[in-house]
């Protein structure tokens, strides 16, 4: 992905304006409790910490570097690229993993297909399906607007 984007970039200026922003995305979360015998219980609602993703957006001229504190699944990455007002956007996973426990950032379709909980990170994910896409769209648009794109 990075190589495909880099190959398309033409440097036409000696200096480029730089802007950046950091934001946090919060959605309802879930807790997974293991019981004796191997059974697992999912807890949601009051008393459960929200699921959080730390977002970093940096604009270098007409290039955007957009970082996430977890690993963004492809469908979400494609949607972010569609929303970008810049032609060249590079998505960076795990850029602040120690600051937020985002883990794998699943899209709802992938989550729904994994009924057997075999995807890496699915069982332990604190993400509650149904919230990330809309919040990611909102934050992405707001962040690009704030940095002047």
Predicted regions and their residues:
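Non-catalytic substrate/cofactor recognition surfaces at enzyme active-site rims
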Residues: 1-149
């Amino acid at each position: 992905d990075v190589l495909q984007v880099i190959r398309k970039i033409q440097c036409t200026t000696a200096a480029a304006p730089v802007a950046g922003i950091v934001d946090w995305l919060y959605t309802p979360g879930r807790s997974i409790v293991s019981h004796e015998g191997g059974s697992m219980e999912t807890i949601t609602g009051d008393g459960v910490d929200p699921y959080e993703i730390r977002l970093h957006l940096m604009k270098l001229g007409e290039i955007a570097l957009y970082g996430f504190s977890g690993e963004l699944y492809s469908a979400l990455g494609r949607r972010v690229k569609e929303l970008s007002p810049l032609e060249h956007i590079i998505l960076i996973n795990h850029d602040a993993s120690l600051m937020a426990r985002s883990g794998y950032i699943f899209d709802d379709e992938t989550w729904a297909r994994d009924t057997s909980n075999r995807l890496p990170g699915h069982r332990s994910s604190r993400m509650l399906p149904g919230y990330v896409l809309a919040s990611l769209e909102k934050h992405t648009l707001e962040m690009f607007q704030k940095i002047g794109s």
